[in-house]
Regions:
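Glycine-/charge-enriched secondary-structure boundary and capping motifs
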Residues: 1-10, 14-16, 20-33, 171-173, ...
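Generic alpha-helical segment signature
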Residues: 10-13, 240, 603
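A generic alpha-helix structural signal
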Residues: 21, 37, 53, 109, ...
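Non-catalytic terminal/interface segments that mediate subunit docking, oligomerization
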Residues: 44, 53-103, 107-109, 113, ...
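Short histidine-centered beta-strand/loop micro-motifs
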Residues: 188-191, 414, 660-662
């Protein structure tokens, strides 16, 4: 008898249970209930987000595969396709930071090579609580070590990403992992069974008890006690995954298999039921044949285990021996555990008894889709209303404090733990506006960027959703890349709270507008709800991963000032906006609004101008203006170039000086160029109706920033670099 306590343990409501009984035609047994629990979880079933996600633009001439498969696929020409996706591993990384982050990397890698692609790069978007608190530092160290430990051992470069710090992430750190791979477009594989009578093979590592109900755990709030959920976190083996990659690609090459699915969230349950549902078939499985590393496992445990480094393959019977020979060579299990059958049902036997008999359509396609109550977000009040924001007494000190804020400070302490050069495709080191990856044998290159500003999104969710897309595309423009597609990881609190659903709906609206403006399709992604501990939700955090193409890598724009005497030009308009800025937060201890406004038409023009100038070879450097505004962008341009080069800049009167220096107005890029190319750039700007102003030059060994001739900031590059470079390492040294 299934009572309310059992339903609560499985995160199912009484109404959902009634629907299950109706679909199955009887009351399910406990193992069958476990199957519905994981497949109808928020993590797998998207029951609170599906009605909104389907509004996203997913079509385009380059789209080979959009949402619905293990990863999105875009045609990039020359017979190649790029396969990419982003996923979250937030809840596991809070409970067990090292393994949570490591298996997040492992899972996204499998999503990519399941499609037949070889992973060529990983990026990550990380959010932690303030690093001056011991627990937050411990989580951060564990997460970074987990990413490095798995990625480095597997042999995939971690080429960039973003790291933010905010008190809201102290109880809910976010670990979003993006992966990109390459495949010949005529050798893409899908999760399908294809034909009745085909063999179902279990390949890879053995099944244990780790990760059981991991998907369900990721679909619920945390309370005061999380230690008991530690067994829900999977344990990864990157060396086993490397063997699995090579064995899978070798079996795919001659077409020995007809379909393949990663055993990720919900494990064997998800892979069997989804493959059957997509192909309109059924599957029969004998659990006695499943390789197990622990004794006495029950059907419930075997079906729901999320042990890592496992795949489900479907092959024609006459090909099974060939597949097994390949996996034996790589010292991996490849065992026939069942077959494809007619009837559209998942039938599972254990010790000779039938323990599961369920319609796959009910498991996969008939999960309820909720239009949850929502409250439209209220616009944030203007910064300074009620309590005016005073100007700093000393702008140079404010500038140095901003450079040392953990969100802005140098992240080399993190990046240096990652191998970013393995595979030798990495063209730009981590820290550039976007990652750039060579396409060997071609002049073309791929670029990728991850972006999302959670504070801006809290203050204005719709603009925050649009701005995440816009900034990711802007970062691509800064390296000379044209955006071609986007994947998303949407991190929110409890969707049962109307204010959270209101934020989510508004973010989706903003993303839709921006994706349409840039004509880029959404190829898939992930929603992570219930980032909520003891009733407190994180700031809404959409993270957008945009992929782009550089037609000639020799014209890619590298970060950093190059030569004394070069002219510094600001593309775009600075407005009187300090709301939601890192300056307001770090210097004044406030998080007022409103967020900076975004005009997508202006944004497109600025990016198009930057791309055109890059293609013409006019730019020596380009850097987008985001956290910290113009002052930080100029400083970073000094740091990424020759360390002995400063800049002298004089800005117009008319705006608050702190808004000029530190405001985060959208749609701006700081570029440097040779004096001989200035007139051509300004002419292009006039023709394209883009505001562009020569604001200074690369000069000396100091960063000197003035307004209408009045000096505001005068700091040596050496002093600024020290503040920026040492901020995060010093936190760990001081508190070691």
């Amino acid at each position: 008898m299934i009572d309310d306590r059992i339903l609560k343990d499985h995160n199912l409501t009484r109404d959902e249970f009634k629907l299950i009984v109706k679909l199955v035609g009887r009351e399910p047994n406990l193992t069958e209930l476990g199957i519905f629990s994981v497949m109808w979880s928020e993590h797998c079933g998207y029951k609170s987000s599906r009605v909104h996600l389907k509004k996203l633009p997913t079509k385009g001439p380059a789209v080979i595969q959009g949402p619905g498969e293990n990863a999105g696929v875009l045609d990039i020409g020359d017979g190649l396709a790029v396969v990419f996706k982003i996923e979250s591993h937030n809840h596991p990384s809070f409970i067990e930071p090292y393994q949570g982050a490591a298996t997040g990397v492992g899972g996204i890698l499998r999503d990519i090579f399941t499609m037949g692609a070889r992973p060529i790069a990983v990026m990550d978007s990380l959010r932690f609580g303030p690093p001056d608190q011991p627990k937050n530092r411990s989580i951060m160290e564990g997460v970074v070590s987990g990413i490095a430990g798995y990625g480095n051992s597997f042999g995939v470069p971690t080429v960039g990403g973003e790291v933010y710090f905010d008190a809201g992430y102290a109880q809910n750190p976010l670990v979003n992992v993006f992966c990109l791979g390459l495949v010949q477009k005529d050798k893409i594989f899908y999760a399908k069974t294809e034909g009745v009578g085909n063999a179902v093979l279990y390949v890879g590592a053995k099944t244990g008890r780790d990760g059981i109900h991991g998907a369900t755990m990721a679909s619920a709030e945390f309370g005061k006690e999380t230690e008991h959920k530690r067994p829900n976190v999977q344990v990864g083996d990157p060396f086993k995954e490397k063997l699995l990659l090579e064995a899978c690609l070798e079996a795919m090459e001659p077409g020995l298999i007809v379909g393949i699915q990663d055993m990720g969230a919900a494990g064997l349950t998800c892979s069997t039921s989804e493959m059957a549902a997509k192909s309109g078939t059924g599957i029969e499985v004998d659990l006695d044949l499943v390789p197990q590393r622990e004794a006495g496992m029950t059907p419930y445990e075997i079906m729901l285990s999320e042990s890592q480094e496992r795949m489900l393959m479907v092959a024609r019977p006459e090909r099974v021996a060939d597949v097994q020979a390949i996996f034996a060579k790589w010292d991996l299990d490849a065992v026939v555990i069942g077959k494809v059958v007619e009837g559209g049902r998942l039938k599972v036997r254990f010790h000779g008894d039938e323990v599961i008999d369920l319609p796959v359509d009910a498991i996969v396609n008939l999960c309820p889709a909720y239009k949850r109550p929502s409250v439209k977000p209220k616009p944030a009040k203007a910064a300074g209303k009620g309590a005016p924001v005073s100007l700093p007494d000393n702008f140079s000190k404010a500038f140095l404090k901003l450079l040392a804020s953990p969100t802005i400070a140098d992240k080399e302490w993190i990046f240096r733990q990652y191998d970013h050069m393995v595979q030798t495709n990495t063209a730009f080191l981590p820290g550039a506006d976007a990652a750039v990856l060579r396409l060997k044998g071609s002049r073309r290159a791929l670029a990728a960027s991850l972006d999302g500003n959670s504070l801006h999104t809290r203050l204005d969710p719709k603009t925050g959703g649009a701005a995440a897309v816009a900034e990711a595309c802007r970062n691509l423009a800064c390296v000379g890349a044209r955006p071609i597609g986007v994947t998303n990881c949407l991190n929110f609190g409890n969707p049962e709270k109307p204010e959270v659903m209101g934020q989510f709906e508004a973010v989706i609206e903003g993303m839709i507008e921006a994706c349409k403006a840039f004509t880029i399709p959404v190829t898939g992604g992930n929603v992570s709800f219930y980032n909520d501990t003891e009733g407190t939700s994180i700031n809404p955090t959409p993270v957008l991963g945009v992929v782009g193409i550089i037609e000639d890598i020799d014209k890619a724009v590298r970060p950093g000032f190059k030569a004394a005497g070069d002219v510094v030009v600001l593309l775009g308009e600075t407005k009187d906006e300090i709301g939601g800025s890192e300056y307001l937060k770090s210097v004044h201890g406030r998080e007022d609004g409103p967020a900076p406004r975004l005009d997508l038409a202006v944004e497109k023009k600025v990016q198009k101008l930057c791309l055109e100038a890059a293609g013409l070879g006019l730019l020596q450097s380009a850097h987008d203006l985001s956290e910290g505004g113009l002052a930080v962008a100029l400083a970073e341009s000094c740091f990424h170039g020759r360390k002995d080069l400063g800049c002298v800049v004089d800005l117009e009167a008319g705006l608050r000086p702190d808004a000029l220096l530190f405001g985060e107005s959208q749609s701006r890029i700081a570029v440097s160029l040779r004096p001989a190319d200035l007139d051509r750039l300004l002419e292009l700007a006039r023709e394209r109706k883009v505001r562009a102003a020569a604001i200074g030059k690369v000069y000396g060994e100091s960063i000197v920033l003035s307004q209408a001739g009045k000096k505001l900031v005068d700091v040596t590059v050496r002093e600024a670099f020290k503040a920026w470079k040492n901020a995060i390492p010093d936190l760990f040294k001081i508190h070691a």
